[in-house]
Amino acid sequence: MKFAFALAALSTALLAAGPARAQPALAEIKVSYQPALYWALPFYVATEKGWWAEVGLKPEFSTFPAGVPQIAASASKSWDVGGTGSVPAVLGHVRFGIKTIGLTNDESAGNALLVRKDVADKFTKDPASMKGQTILLTANSTGDYAVQSCLKKYGLTKADVTIKNMGQAEIISAVSSNNADLAGLWAPNIYTLEEKAGAKVLCSGKEGSAMVPGALIARGEYAESNPENVAKFLAVYLRAWSWLNANKPQAIEMMTKFYAQGGVSISPASMMKEFTTRPTYTLAQQLTAMDRTRGTSNMDGWFADIATFMRGTGAIQSIPASADYVTDAYMKRVQADPKLREFANRSN
């Protein structure tokens, strides 16, 4: 009897374990980003909501202070997919074969040239007086691109000023301590300097007529070998934006927590400004931006302008064809899969 009871118990346990064993294992995917940035918020939201597992992914995150070290880390395969600025995305293609697979946001207004409050009136009234001055910025970044577009707006060139390459935290410290007058920053660092030191935005990338897109990226080798995982990654990212844009009060709450993790504290008003000044893209809008049915796409043009700027700075030697690295193949996979498409567009 004892044997029979034990056998029955074992059979029951095996039956109970059967369905659990049948569940497919989650696919690990290494996701890279820069902390406490607007376009990286979807990664945090998706994790808090448990959406990665819903599509069969298990993310492993790595963060970087800026795009250049992030791109360099791809050489050791320390990440598979992620988000970055458009300038490092182009650099990543040239140096490491990285693919641009989508857009994080339009951050044209989120990259700017700022001026210290004590000299704000001087440079606002006479921007040309920046000639001969020193501008602190992070080289080969979207902030660099925005600053140079602003200089062009005012009839100046990079040769007319002294550029000093520094990290964003160092720039904030220098301006706050009155050791610098002019600086190139991206949001939310812009808001930090405005709120903590009273700095003023002299000119944004948008005001300098520069389109500054943020990029979703993937290592070329990984994307080629794991196209389904890349499509799932995109679907998760898009769903997070769908939810964020439909639930602003909760979005601000989550942004507050996410920014705090990266040591950033800005006012709710500045957080809302992130949403109102930096458009994001639905699945349909992503596909429209990448559409080449009539020739070059909008994204092709934006990234060609970025590459032209980079050749001018000496970061790259020639301008690569956008079609060599900007690809809609993975967004199209999301669109073609009914489940992923519905998931990406879900706002709850």
Predicted feature locations:
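Bacterial N-terminal signal peptides
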Residues: 4-16
